[in-house]
Amino acid sequence: MARRTEPPDGGWGWVVVLSAFFQSALVFGVLRSFGVFFVEFVAAFEEQAARVSWIASIGIAVQQFGSPVGSALSTKFGPRPVVMTGGILAALGMLLASFATSLTHLYLSIGLLSGSGWALTFAPTLACLSCYFSRRRSLATGLALTGVGLSSFTFAPFFQWLLSHYAWRGSLLLVSALSLHLVACGALLRPPSLAEDPAVGGPRAQLTSLLHHGPFLRYTVALTLINTGYFIPYLHLVAHLQDLDWDPLPAAFLLSVVAISDLVGRVVSGWLGDAVPGPVTRLLMLWTTLTGVSLALFPVAQAPTALVALAVAYGFTSGALAPLAFSVLPELIGTRRIYCGLGLLQMIESIGGLLGPPLSGYLRDVTGNYTASFVVAGAFLLSGSGILLTLPHFFCFSTTTSGPQDLVTEALDTKVPLPKEGLEED
């Protein structure tokens, strides 16, 4: 049977979207709700906030830094067995964490082992999804990533309820059971049968071309800065509210308010990304700027109504930037290099995920509150949005819409030419 030269823009791709939906929920929904466990770990181990912050920080960093491994394995063996293996590792890490007697045990179990499992699930799934869609890519990505918002809405109060009934050890056992569902999600993945382009080259040739691709490198710097501040509210907002004398349950509920807005933001952003003409980078820059501003305003808000309003604004804008961050990548490098490109991008931006939470915790320990933590986090996002201005076609307002072929080929400001790539699917 002849292979397609263009993505089907549907078909089994919608099953892949469903799989990605649950995977994003079980990976980032857990990470975003980990602020509920943060307070428990500080009390249980009698450690400073900066040291406890390393648990989630290591998990985020390993998930992103290990993404090239997941991408390379998916290129060789396909995404299905790789993602299923990742689900087993993620569940095993949470299981071992329930027996932890020190922070080092949590660093190794949640940070290293579960983080490795997440690295094998997220990037291969999104790369597989990108190969199924072209015209509807932003919408499909937005729908897939709504799992993050939906799970954040449900997981934060659910985890708080678990802690009140089973303590943190029993709660981690149940989180381990939830993580096993990643195995079922991986079983649904099936790459489309697209005609191969031998001119693209193997993994080494693709990696070399990307490392000399100016727009791609600038984009990774921008996302690294964004990633440094992006997760701070999900880790420290509950603790910040408790410093303002909020009870634990209402504080966890505010994370659910953020999650609902995040959910709406992802869907709206995915629709706008496909509907608005021009590069998706412009919309990404808009949402990133608004997210940075709302982050910096958190310490200013004191009244409950102001905090709820700010949580709604932050949730919507932070959710809106997420699907576009992945939709921009195929515009820059094409879909033929998406496995390698997405893995490399996740690895480089892991630097931000590694440094952001401990820096925020350190500022809390030094200053005695989270004011500096939120202001600095907002500054990182604003810096990243500034770098997005340098990407190709950002200021191009021609009435003639540039196709993805133009976006890829004209973006190459490198001395090492990229292999020619058939981009008819874009």
From Swiss-Prot:
Membrane topology per record: Multi-pass membrane protein
GO function terms (MF aspect): monocarboxylic acid transmembrane transporter activity; symporter activity
A Pfam family: MFS_1
Gene3D superfamilies: MFS general substrate transporter like domains
Cytoplasmic side, ranges: 1-10, 395-426
InterPro entries noted in UniProt: MFS, MFS_dom, MFS_MCT_13, MFS_trans_sf, Proton-linked_MCT
Functional note: Proton-linked monocarboxylate transporter. May catalyze the transport of monocarboxylates across the plasma membrane.
Disorder: Type 2 diabetes mellitus: A multifactorial disorder of glucose homeostasis caused by a lack of sensitivity to insulin. Affected individuals usually have an obese body habitus and manifestations of a metabolic syndrome characterized by diabetes, insulin resistance, hypertension and hypertriglyceridemia. The disease results in long-term complications that affect the eyes, kidneys, nerves, and blood vessels.
Family, similarity comment: Belongs to the major facilitator superfamily. Monocarboxylate porter (TC 2.A.1.13) family.
Name of the protein described by the UniProt record: Monocarboxylate transporter 13
Organism: Homo sapiens (Human)
Protein's gene: SLC16A13
